[in-house]
From Swiss-Prot:
Pfam families: RNA_pol_A_bac, RNA_pol_A_CTD, RNA_pol_L. This is DNA-directed RNA polymerase subunit alpha. Residues 10-233 are annotated as: Alpha N-terminal domain (alpha-NTD). It is found in: Plastid, Chloroplast. Gene3D superfamilies: 5' to 3' exonuclease, C-terminal subdomain, DNA-directed RNA polymerase, insert domain, RNA polymerase, RBP11-like subunit.
Length: 337
């Protein structure tokens, strides 16, 4: 466990981690402070951040099991101690970490007798298990235990519905939330009009993300939500005669690029996030895993740097170069200077 003495800055607003610990492979804890804040700001930020931590961060789960030998979810199989329903519940608890986009397939094929655990899951290379010891089933006889799995990356909850049931395929209620819990508290100091606040934020995660990673992801998601309001056309800010609404033009990546070309000084490159571009989601996820979130981050890398990214291909670099050349009339350096 790591603890740091809390010191309050009287100048620049800043985040700081004051405590972090790993309780288990599936439970991480972090405590952060943000200061100095004006009166009322801590609650505003704390509420928004807690919502983003619990609802906006994506996670990876097993969402479906496939086996033609299982008649129904509540049946039992000779040679297996657990019922099918119990096995599904155990698979629901498996914690995965990935840069997967959408769905992917995995499988388990084990011969008994013995215990089946998370380490027996055969996964694609871009998915990893947080805790290999998680129990799935106990095989009491020399039988073959072979099932297919569907893995999905999403956010929030996925509740199985009747139309999701297929012959030999069983959906699992999935909880995609990497953050188990988040709380915020406020400490006030100072007197009168000079009163200020410190925001304390506590984050518990399931091990697929660290609290610091979760905080970064939630912050970026909040920024993405608010950017459209910063860059809408000025003409749309004023009501015309006989109008009772303010028309907001649809926010697109291309609109922002066009405005940047006209006057690069007005919009910082760091305010353009790559997930708003026309890049395929697979390319975006690869960039994100390398901490490339904005156009500024991208331009700070060479073609050679991009080719070193895991699962990145030459076609992906060409796709990025095409966008940069089309909308910025610039090229990405082949090598670092």
């Amino acid at each position: 466990m790591v603890r740091e003495k809390v010191t309050v800055s009287t100048r620049t607003l800043q985040w700081k981690c004051v405590e972090s610990r790993t309780d288990s492979k599936r439970l991480y804890y972090g405590r952060f402070i943000l200061s100095p804040l004006m009166k009322g700001q801590a609650d505003t930020i704390g509420i928004a951040m807690r919502r983003a931590l619990l609802g906006e961060i994506e996670g990876t789960c097993i969402t479906r099991v496939k086996s033609e030998k299982v008649p129904h979810e509540y049946s039992t199989i000779t040679g297996i101690q657990e019922s099918v329903h119990e096995i599904l519940m155990n698979l629901k608890e498996i914690i995965l970490r990935s840069n997967l986009y959408g769905t992917s397939d995995a499988s388990i094929c084990v011969k008994g007798p013995g215990s089946v655990t998370a380490q027996d899951i055969i996964l694609p290379p871009y998915v990893e298990i947080v805790d290999n010891t998680q129990h799935i089933a106990s095989l009491t006889e020399p039988i073959d235990f072979c099932i297919g799995l569907q893995i999905e990356r999403n956010r929030g909850y996925l509740i199985k519905t009747p139309h999701n049931f297929q012959d030999g395929s069983y959906p699992i209620d999935a909880v995609f939330m990497p953050v188990r819990n988040a709380n915020h508290s406020i400490h006030s100091y100072g007197n009168g009009n000079e009163k200020q606040e410190i925001l304390f934020l506590e984050i518990w995660t399931n091990g697929s993300l660290t609290p610091k990673e979760a905080l970064h992801e939630a912050s970026r998601n909040l920024i993405d939500l608010f950017i459209p309001f910063l860059h809408m056309e000025e003409d749309n800010l004023y009501l015309q005669d006989n109008q009772h609404t303010v028309p907001l033009s649809p926010f697109t990546f291309h609109d922002k690029l066009a405005k940047l070309i006209k006057n690069k000084k007005k919009i910082a490159l760091k305010s353009i996030f790559i997930d708003q571009s026309e890049l395929p989601s697979r390319i975006y996820n690869c960039l994100k895993m390398s901490n490339i979130y904005t156009l500024l981050d991208l331009l700070n890398n060479s073609q050679e740097d991009l080719m070193k990214i895991e699962h990145f291909r030459s076609e992906d670099v060409k796709r990025i170069l095409g966008i940069l050349e089309k909308y910025f009339v610039i090229d990405l350096a082949k090598n670092k200077f």
